Swiss-Prot record:
Keyword Thylakoid part of the UniProt annotation: no
Species classification: Eukaryota, Metazoa, Chordata, Craniata, Vertebrata
Basic and acidic residues bias locations: 188-202
Entry protein name: Homeobox protein Meis1
Family as reported in the entry's similarity comment: Belongs to the TALE/MEIS homeobox family.
Subcellular location: Cytoplasm; Nucleus
GO cellular component, one term: cytoplasm
GO BP, sorted A to Z: angiogenesis; animal organ morphogenesis; brain development; embryonic pattern specification; eye development; hemopoiesis; neural crest cell fate specification; positive regulation of cell population proliferation
Listed InterPro entries: HD, Homeodomain-like_sf, KN_HD, PKNOX/Meis_N, TALE_homeobox
Residues in MEIS N-terminal domain copies: 108-191
CDD domains per the UniProt record, alphabetical: homeodomain
The organism of origin for this protein: Xenopus laevis (African clawed frog)
SMART domains, A to Z: HOX (SM00389)
PANTHER family: HOMEOBOX PROTEIN TRANSCRIPTION FACTORS (PTHR11850)
Gene: meis1
DNA-binding region as annotated in the record: 272-334
Length: 390
């Protein structure tokens, strides 16, 4: 009878290594029925053998006692079956796989896996064969035990599959987050770097350059709003370009720290660049110089963006984003400040001196130039608050 189950495909590797007998205990040891007295109130294991078990109250006392004796014999035969320790083991594995938190990589985490149960089957079969046969003399009970073990094993495989799907989802979700977070960090660094660049510019721009920028900007606004430039305005446009270039040189000198011999240190240069943002210092200086040379229209064309990208070593997208931030944080505050000065009825003068003439440190006396045909128009347009910059 036992030979029918020797070649079952579900239990490959029935021959294995030895296992201490204390792991499973003696399957034929006497068991106390006090621990399972509640089973007497449940349905019988084989209802077809006891068709009147549901009406025990109507039975004679002698017949009720015989039914209870039969149930006790069935329980004893199940508890004493050679495969019962294996059934209890896989039931415990299913319970652990359901309620135990899983931590991959932790020692002992595979104690409830299906592979571990395959090893347990091999160990159990070798141990039990050395002591007694695997099956009893009751084929029906043997079949019941085999089917119960199969059902629990399928359940264990399903639980393992659910855990694999959960782990796969968590891994993919974490990978997706890790792949997107660096982009967000780069955007934050880029915004922070542009903000620090604009703050450095407003702090380091020399006060002596601001009046010349104001006059140049007034002339540029008058040219854009008045139409064709007059003779005097044309000559002053070149002077504006010269002032812008001088301002760019002054900007570079004001930002650069005094030469102490440590500027050649590449490590300190990297730290300085990292503190200022993601763009190198040389690249921001080049783009600032271009911005102040084209304040009347600070919108570089595609060709100019390509040229700036080559000069700075940045990408076209980085150059474009820098100019977007610069127009918002550098150019616009200057325009707002000029508009406030014009709305008060006097031209912009940071030192509070008359526009007729003043002397700055290290420069000769400067007087206002003779008003040309376009400069008067620019002043009128400025007084009316109708300047057009971009």
């Amino acid at each position: 009878m036992a030979q029918r189950y020797d070649d079952l495909p579900h239990y490959g590797g029935m021959d294995g290594v030895g296992l201490p007998s204390s792991m499973y205990g003696d399957p034929h040891a006497a068991r106390s029925m006090k621990s399972v007295h509640h089973l007497n109130h449940g349905p019988p294991l084989h209802p077809h053998q006891y068709p009147h078990s549901a009406h025990t109250n109507a039975m004679p006392p002698s017949m009720g006692s015989s039914v209870n004796d039969a149930l006790k014999r069935d329980k004893d035969s199940i508890y004493g079956h050679p495969l019962f320790p294996l059934l209890a083991l896989i039931f415990e594995k299913c319970e652990l796989a359901t309620c135990t938190p899983r931590e991959p990589g932790v020692a002992g985490g595979d104690v409830c896996s299906s592979e571990s149960f395959n090893e347990d089957i091999a160990v159990f079969s070798k141990q039990i064969r050395a002591e007694k046969p695997l099956f009893s003399s009751n084929p029906e009970l043997d079949n019941l035990m085999i089917q119960a073990i199969q059902v629990l094993r399928f359940h264990l495989l399903e639980l393992e599959k659910v855990h694999e799907l959960c782990d796969n989802f968590c891994h993919r979700y974490i990978s997706c987050l890790e792949g997107k977070m660096p982009i967000d960090l780069v955007i934050d660094d880029r915004d922070g770097g542009s903000k620090s660049d604009s703050e450095d510019l407003t702090r380091s721009a020399p006060l002596t350059d601001q009046p010349s920028w104001s006059r140049d900007h007034d002339d540029a606004a008058s040219i854009r709003s008045g139409g064709t430039p007059g003779p005097s305005s044309g000559g002053h446009t070149s002077h504006s370009g010269d002032n812008s270039s001088e301002q760019g040189d002054g900007l570079d000198n004001s930002i650069a720290s005094p030469s102490t011999g440590d500027d050649d240190d590449p490590d300190k240069e990297k730290k300085r660049n990292k503190g200022r943002g993601i763009f190198p210092k040389v690249a921001t200086n080049i783009m600032r110089a271009w911005l102040f040379q084209h304040l009347t229209h600070p919108y570089p064309s595609e060709e100019q963006k390509k040229q700036l990208a080559q000069d700075t070593g940045l990408t076209i997208l980085q150059v474009n984003n820098w100019f977007i931030n610069a127009r918002r944080r550098i150019v616009q505050p200057m325009i707002d400040q000029s508009n406030r000065a014009v709305s008060q009825g006097t031209p912009y003068n940071p030192d509070g001196q008359p526009i007729g003439g003043f002397v700055m440190d290290g420069q000769q006396h400067m007087g206002i130039r003779a008003p040309g045909p376009m400069s008067g128009m620019g002043m009128n347009m400025g007084m009316e608050g109708q300047w057009h910059y971009m």
